[in-house]
Amino acid sequence: MPIVFNPSFTVAERELRWGRVRQRMAAEKLDCLIAFPNQGRFEQLQANTRYLTQMGGFATEVAVVFPLANEVTAFVQSPGDVDWWSKAQCWITDVRCSRRVWAKAMIERLKELKFSRVGVIGLSGLKRAPEGVVPWTMLENVKKAFPNAEFVNATHITLEARAVKSAEEIAFIEKAEHIAEASVTAMFKIARAGVRENELYAEMLKTMVAEGGELPTMLYWSAGRPGIRHLVPTPSPLAAGDVIANEIEGKFCGYIAQIGAPAIVGPIPDKTIATYEAAAKLFDNLCSVIKAGRKLPDVGRDYVQMVKDAGYQPAAWPLHGRGLGDDLPIMQNALAETDETFEEGHVLIIKPGMIDPNDTSDSNERVGDTVVVTKTGARRLGKLPLVITSIPL
């Protein structure tokens, strides 16, 4: 039986990415970049390595040596991985086996190059991993092998290169969106009072993989009154009146789309329906003002005013880039001061929160989806309605 590999990016896409990165390397006088394996946070901590190699998924460990002007070398764990990844992608021909001794394999490659200044990806600069994601012993072994070389943080170089998505990348994210929505449809087909959380979780993962999705991925969930958001699927059965809040990520060849699928077990109160209708309108209105060239704080102020005009209070303001992980731009609160502007090709998750001032539970009602920034506004990738769903009793 011939192997049918997952889709891969074109050589033209490789040249676009590598050109962006090498231009930034040259500006900072870096002779080489190195990145070590780290499959943490659903493999998002390995996003920069995947951007350079398009290798990864299903907990595959990948490292890379990325010279300014010579052949790029990727490192995987076993000879079998070398065989697989030499066939599964067309970007890198020099794929080497580490046998889990990553620094040793990378040192051997670095000895073949001439360099004095090395950029280390992952030392610092990640919003959700501010202390860095580089294994200390691996880096120390590399530094000891080259005592005369200078090693500096270079996380920002790949983060900046990743921020604006190409047409090929957006197509992969659209596929990830389809995968996420298919999993939601599958979940609601079997969801009813008495069905366990872990049964729903299993049905969603089954659907994702069957649709070409990749694991690990994030399913963030809470149910009950009040709910505690968690990542661990429990054997808790759904019960009448449970309010389900979630963040569901589909992943395709490493690229992520996130959606929300709020629900209530049983009839939905009219007041709740009205609140979610207001949340959907807020989402649409925000999409109309998130345009290429606008500053992030200006949109944040728009959000605050829109919420107040609707008779609610501002709440959580997650607006952050998505792609292979936590991509730029990231705006952690609506009134954060930054000079950043939206650019055409930014891909974002927007899920603006709003609080009913008369709601004693202080619940944060919101809808969310993945969008692409254009000159005229943010284009929503999803097709499912932005509503709260009633789950049968």
Model regions: which residues?
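Active-site neighborhoods and metal-handling regions in enzymes and metal-associated proteins
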Residues: 1-393
